[in-house]
Amino acid sequence: MANEKLLEIKNLTVHYQSHDATVHAVENLNLSLGNGETLGLVGETGAGKTTTVKTIMRILPTPPARVVSGEIFFDGQDLLKISEKEMRKIRGKEIAMIFQDPMTSLNPVMTVADQIAEVIRLHDGGSRAEAHKKACDMLELVGIRPERGSDYPHQFSGGMKQRVVIAMALACNPRFLIADEPTTALDVTIQAQVLELMKKLKAQYQTAMVMITHDLGIVAEICDYVAIMYAGEVVEYGTREHIFNSTAHPYTKGLFACIPDIFTEQNELVPINGLTPDPTDLPQGCRFNPRCPYATERCRQEHPENVEIEPGHFVACHLINGGGNENA
């Protein structure tokens, strides 16, 4: 993790309360990120990735969501303790988010330039003309002709809409960008274009970024650090090289085993058995133990702690941390 931390999350726990149960969405999460770095949050649906970033943005619906404990420091300021008025000055200006589905992220009755200009005027001020000019400049930056700023969202393809959303997120030069599966709704060729664009803009503006994805190919392409999440917890954290070259946790190994490898003669993919646990009724001990082929009695009884197995590489697994098979 970086010496100069822009973002630092400490012991974050977030629950959702239903009429008859508590959903344990995120439990005791610890992460940090430095200026200009990219962190990949990887895991299956329901791992707690989106809840984590929405907590950073403070856009979780409350109720039913509730931050039980923890701190989120951005540039030394705890975002969970400031007022909503103060947070509005940060949200969109210092911290911006690219949402998962560009089709539903844009207002259908406003031109795309007006939508970008609205963000610019809210945070940077200036006249309508100045904001509109900058909005058109941002469209050009993401590869859209400025004259198309007068068009409405329905006049753009899915990939072009995602470019508009990226332009809107970057309009105020945020120091920290959150991208929630920004390429999920796009076809493969457009995915590649959008990723290349994000890499270029990240380098140009030195923006720190959290990328939520379940695609390890995207992680390899764009991330410096990786946090593998399972059932609300980070089970493995390290640099991209740690995760790809020194995979340690059985769950992480299971994710890689699900990916076709053109360099082997393997004929079948090896899926991870079972399903993610019910977040209202989590298993005792390690949360992955019901699906883990190497689980021991200790795994079923004791919750594993995160241990640093090499500098900067953390794993929460009894098999790695002592008392089990290190080659699991």
Residue ranges and their predicted role:
Residues D151-F156, M160:
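Conserved ABC ATPase signature
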Residues K5, G149, T239-A328:
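Short catalytic/signature loops enriched in Gly
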Residues R58, I178, P182, L186-N267:
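P-loop NTP-binding/switch modules centered on Walker-like glycine-rich loops
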Residues E71-D78, A129-E147, F256-A257:
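Conserved ABC ATPase "signature" region
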Residues L79-A96, L122, H242-T247, P277-P283:
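ABC ATPase NBD coupling module
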Residues A171-R175:
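A short, proline-enriched helix->beta-strand linker immediately N-terminal to the Walker B motif
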